[in-house]
Design a protein with these regions (language model features):
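Glycine-rich segments within core transmembrane alpha-helices of 12-TM secondary carriers
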Residues: 28, 325-330
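Short, strongly hydrophobic transmembrane alpha-helices
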Residues: 14-41
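Short, solvent-exposed beta-strand edge segments and adjacent coil->beta transition regions
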Residues: 55, 200-204, 298
Length: 330
């Protein structure tokens, strides 16, 4: 206890040293912690997917144009994935510039068209109602979007007019996952609402354990005709890309920038380096300032040793002083 009191008295007496050292270390730690939180959030994108490393999307390459798509819309000279290896399969269609009508108000909406299997692969917290698309008219709204349309009213059972002229019924309200997500939307619609959508869907697969993904990619690397080559000589190839990797390939999702987020590994590496440098700078600055203070207190420590203070007590003084500074900075 005496050692603690002495250490505290020294820090209070040397106010300039304490303030400068404390501010330097606090700023360094604050910046490092903020950067580390950002880096961690980037590295945990889409962890709401039940198995993001083993849920795959179809990436097609048509004459150099890469994008997320599906195989079932290619009807000529193509190959499908053997259902014996598939544990779960779903599709989704992103509609970035869509809208719904509530009363007389036309409200822009980012719509995601899918089916109930989607929720077997991606976990979304349910805030109100139920998380299902049991009927073609079923719709799920995000909590933020529901508040935008209905305010504080109960949105469950409310009817909206979709852009194709059909009515949709709000069945549930979904919350935001704790992690950052690649796909962002306002409304989830049932794929059964219409037989004809304005764009092609993207297929997602979860394969059974032991499935040879490399063999599927090898098969997909063989060019195949999109249509009858007598009229259309274009070819396409396909490969599987995991949900974990989609976020890091912005070229696949840059057509819908308002619905899809993407990251950059190079930026993350640079930020990691900056974070490390900030942390090292703060630590070195802390050590240098304390060494200067230690040199100035050389006579004081010498007198203490003359009066019988042991080395362990002096070390405890130094250790407690630094611990108090670090804890204060944090």
């Amino acid at each position: 206890m005496k050692t603690l009191k002495y250490s505290w008295r020294f820090l209070m007496r040397s106010k300039s040293y304490t303030i400068i050292n404390l501010l330097g270390l606090a700023c360094s730690l604050a910046c490092s912690i903020i950067l580390m939180r950002y880096i961690h959030r980037e590295l945990t994108v889409d962890t709401h997917c039940i198995d993001r490393e083993h849920v795959y999307a179809i990436c097609t390459n048509t004459e150099g144009n890469r994008g997320l798509s599906g195989l079932k819309q290619y009807n000529y000279d193509t190959i499908s994935i053997d259902n014996r290896f598939v544990e779960a399969m779903t599709t989704y269609i992103p509609l970035e510039k869509d809208y719904v009508i509530s009363g007389t108000n036309r409200i822009p909406a980012r719509c995601l068209v899918t089916d109930s299997v989607f929720f077997q692969l991606f976990h979304y917290p349910i805030v109100q109602g139920k998380l299902s698309l049991t009927t073609p008219q079923s719709a799920l709204l995000t909590e933020k979007y529901a508040r935008k349309i209905f305010g504080n009213e109960n949105p469950i059972g409310k009817v909206l007019r979709y852009s194709n002229g059909k009515d949709i019924t709000v069945e549930g309200i979904v919350g935001e996952p704790e992690c950052k997500t690649t796909i962002n939307f306002d409304i989830i619609l049932s794929s059964k609402l219409s037989q004809h959508w304005e764009r092609m869907n993207t297929e997602l697969y979860r394969f059974l354990p032991g499935t040879d993904i490399n063999a599927i990619n090898k098969t997909g690397s063989v060019p195949r005709y999109i249509n009858d080559p007598e009229y259309d000589t274009r070819t396409h190839t396909f490969s599987l890309i995991s949900v974990k990797d989609i976020y890091w390939d912005g070229s696949l999702t840059d057509r819908e920038p308002a619905m899809f987020l993407s990251g950059n590994h190079s930026h993350l590496i640079i930020l990691s380096g900056v974070c490390l440098l900030l942390l090292l700078t703060g630590i070195l600055n802390f050590i240098n300032l304390y060494l200067v203070a230690l040199l100035r207190r050389g006579k004081e420590y010498g007198l203490k040793k003359v009066f019988g203070v042991c080395g362990k007590t002096l070390f405890a003084n130094i250790w407690i002083e630094n611990t108090l500074l670090v804890l204060s900075a944090l």
